[in-house]
Amino acid sequence: MSRVRISLIYLYTLVVITTTKTIEYTACNDTIIIPCTIDNPTKYIRWKLDNHDILTYNKTSKTTILSKWHTSARLHSLSDSDVSLIIEYKDILPGTYTCEDNTGIKSTVKLVQLHTNWFNDYQTMLMFIFTGITLFLLFLEITYTSISVVFSTNLGILQVFGCVIAMIELCGAFLFYPSMFTLRHIIGLLMMTLPSIFLIITKVFSFWLLCKLSCAVHLIIYYQLAGYILTVLGLGLSLKECVDGTLLLSGLGTIMVSEHFSLLFLVCFPSTQRDYY
C-alpha cells in the first residue's frame, strides 16, 4: 500500500500541468514578455509557437538554440524558476506559445493582437479641427476676393484652385477617419496635409488681385511656409503606428493661424492702389 502511494506521489510530480493564459498586445509594444515559471529542476527549456520551436535552452551546457524566424527571443532570467520569454514585436506572431521542459511540465500562453489607432482620439480630433478651420478660412478669403474685384481669368483660376484644394483635403479626411494604420488611412492623411502648400499660391493670388502685396504679406507667407515644413517633418515621423503627432499638429496649427492673419490683412488693410483687376 505504501509502495502504491509513493508511486502516485511520484507520478503526480511528473504529470503535465498546463496553465493557459491570454495576453493581448498591440503595435505599441516594443517587446513582449510571455510568462512561464517552472519549479521542478530541468535539463532543458523549450519554447514553442504552436508546433514550431522558438528557443531551446540547455541548462547543462548553457547553450541556446534560436529559430531563424525569432532571432530576438531570449529568456527573461536564467534562474531555476523564471523562464519567461522576451521577444521583440517584429518577431511576434499571434498564436499559442508553449513552455516545456524534460519533465513534461508546460505553461501555455495565447497571444492575441489588438488593433490600435494610429493617433490618439485627442490628436485625431485636433487634426480634423485644424483642417476644417483652414478650409473655412480659405473659403472666406476666396469669397472676399471674388466680391471685391471684377471677375477675370485670374480670379477664375483662384476659385478653381481653391475648390480643388478643398475637394482633395475633404476626400483625404473621409479616407483618414478613423485613424487606423493602413494604406488607405496613410493616403487619407497625405491628402489632408500635403495640399496645404498650395494655400500659399492662393494667398499670393488673393493679395495680388487686391493689390495688397507688402512686407507684411511676405511675413505671413513665410510663416505659413514654416508651418508646412513642420507638417512635412511631422508626417515623416508619423509613418508608423503608435506615434506622437505633436509635430504634425504644430504644423497644421501654424497653417491655420497664418490663414487667420491672411484674412485679417485682406479685410482690414487697404490696397496699395485703387485699380482692381
From Swiss-Prot:
- Transmembrane portions of the chain: 124-144, 156-176, 186-206, 219-239, 247-267
InterPro entries xref list: CD47, CD47-like_TM, CD47_Vset, Ig-like_fold
Give me the glycosylation sites of this protein: 29, 58
Give the bilayer topology: Multi-pass membrane protein
Please provide the record's keywords in A-Z order. Answer: Glycoprotein, Host membrane, Membrane, Transmembrane, Transmembrane helix
Listed Pfam families: CD47 (PF04549), V-set_CD47 (PF08204)
Organism superkingdom: Viruses
GO biological process terms, semicolon-separated:
positive regulation of cell-cell adhesion; positive regulation of inflammatory response; positive regulation of phagocytosis
Question: Could you state a single Gene Ontology molecular function term?
Answer: thrombospondin receptor activity
As recorded in UniProt, coiled-coil segments are none
Keyword Transmembrane helix attached: yes
Primary role:
Promotes, when overexpressed, the influx of extracellular Ca(2+), leading to membrane permeability and host cell necrosis.
Q: What is this protein called?
A: Protein OPG166
Q: Which species does the entry assign this protein to? A: Vaccinia virus (strain Copenhagen)
- This chain is encoded by the gene named OPG166
